[in-house]
Amino acid sequence: MRISTLDRRDMKHIHIIDSHTGGEPTRVVVSGFPALGGGTMAERLAVLAREHDRYRAACILEPRGSDVLVGALLCEPVSAGAAAGVIFFNNAGYLGMCGHGTIGLVRTLHHMGRIGPGVHRIETPVGDVEATLHDDLSVSVRNVLAYRHAKDVVVDVPGHGAVTGDVAWGGNWFFLVSDHGQRVAGENVAALAAYASAVRAALERAGVTGRDGAPIDHIELFADDPEYDSRSFVLCPGHAYDRSPCGTGTSAKLACLAADGKLAAGVTWRQASVIGSVFSASYAAAEGGVVPTIRGSAHLSAEATLVIEDDDPFGWGIAS
């Protein structure tokens, strides 16, 4: 058979499995990334960001990805007792932890035949998390320690006036706002995103940060919900909004509720997203904060091989 010149081009191949958790997509990278060494997930993240960031861009940016997509690089764990290691990333950079992404990863590991129902340890750049795959294929994630860093922080937002919120850590840094005057609904996401972007810019101008000067890159707006305990809109880094209720954001919310004495340990909190998907959450008390557990479900959506041709001018993504 005659092979065309096109077929003989040098190509790089990246094997992926896509899923979504409550509408929020996760792209698990199974193979095709460069070796990152045998260090911790935090050390491997640093190598990936410093030396091989174009692979993140190729997977997540257009023409192969989108702003809403979260990547999860599947890694061999450091500890023999862990099921997997993972490095999370999106169109804006890297994430220390991702709740919906961990749920998607665990569902994907089951699809790959690597785990069955039960409790599994997952290594992340910010510490180990415990994930339970239930018989119905839903997943509970016992997250890293969550805590409130600052209460009732006020920033001036042009066009909106003074906005008050809490700064909290749930695996990523959040500014959580309940009194915002916005309608948290799926048909209002453009206005919500514009408002949350303005709040994030105001935080940056005011020098409001998380612990040790860490940037606050997630904005979470809460509203009452007739069926669940709360409905939320989460603006992620890179200006995409979270279709799921956001696992790390829900963890940050639990930390604030616990600090205010509004939710007792072990009591279930039902958090709805802006599109109506739901996580169930509770926490255990811990020194310096709370240890949240988030439960949700992921569904598989694709299994494919991404191809990067050497002569493709957009092979490594279109910068946003």
Swiss-Prot record:
NCBIfam families assigned? PRK13970.1
- PANTHER family with a match to the protein in the record: TRANS-3-HYDROXY-L-PROLINE DEHYDRATASE
Q: What is its EC number?
A: 5.1.1.8
Question: Which Pfam families does this one have?
Answer: Pro_racemase (PF05544)
Q: Which domain of life is it from?
A: Bacteria
- Native organism is Burkholderia pseudomallei (strain 1106b)
| Role summary | Catalyzes the epimerization of trans-4-hydroxy-L-proline (t4LHyp) to cis-4-hydroxy-D-proline (c4DHyp). Is likely involved in a degradation pathway that converts t4LHyp to alpha-ketoglutarate.
Q: Which family is annotated?
A: Belongs to the proline racemase family.
A GO MF annotation of the entry reads:
4-hydroxyproline epimerase activity
Report which reactions are catalysed by this protein. Answer: trans-4-hydroxy-L-proline = cis-4-hydroxy-D-proline
Q: Where is the active site?
A: 98 (proton acceptor), 246 (proton donor)
- Respond yes or no to whether keyword Cell membrane is given for this record: no
Summarize where substrate binds, as residue positions.
99-100, 218, 242, 247-248
Q: Does the keyword Isomerase apply?
A: yes
EC top class, as a word: isomerase
Specify the protein name: 4-hydroxyproline 2-epimerase
Which keywords does this chain's UniProt record carry? Isomerase
